[in-house]
Amino acid sequence: MIKLKPYSASILAFGGFLLLAMGVYFIFIRPPLLPEDLRYMKMTLPMGQDKIQGLQMWLRKVFWVIGCYIFTTGLLTIFMAFTSFRTRTRGAYGIVALSGISSIGVMTVVNFMIGSDFKWILLIFTLPWVIALILYRLHK
């Protein structure tokens, strides 16, 4: 049976689970071009079809790779949460903070920069990392 305490580890594991789910979305569900992608490029799908014929096939493969990386980040985050973070191994806080910033943190910031439709969802996905780090510092 997995213990819920310390809460910081459980919340971090939840953040890792969200990344697993996001990875699965990118691998199996996310279309190559979203409506927001076309808006950002100031294109419509019919306008872009002839210009970007092979782009969609290429993007599908790009998103497989990105999805696998996101999934792996989530998997490693869950492992870290239930091992080093839970036992407060030296350096665990810094690694988790840096990992959060360089993964979901940067993804969220960039999505705000481009005005993504998913920016608020990504911000919510960032909260478990922030809460886990705060609770870790508070020894909770």
Where are these regions (language model features)?
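Membrane-interface helix-boundary signature
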Residues: M1-I11, I52-V62, T89-Y93, I114-F118
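Hydrophobic, membrane-inserted alpha-helices
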Residues: L76-M80, G100-V110
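Hydrophobic alpha-helical transmembrane segments of polytopic
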Residues: S8-L18, I66, T73, A92-S103, ...
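Membrane-water interface at the C-terminal end of transmembrane alpha helices
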Residues: P128-K140
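Membrane-helix boundary connector in multi-pass membrane proteins
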Residues: I104-L123
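Juxtamembrane helix-break-helix junctions at the cytosolic face
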Residues: G74-Y93
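Hydrophobic transmembrane helix segments
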Residues: F17-F63, G67-Y69
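Helix-loop junctions at the membrane-solvent interface of multi-pass transporters
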Residues: F28-I29, F112-M113, L138-H139
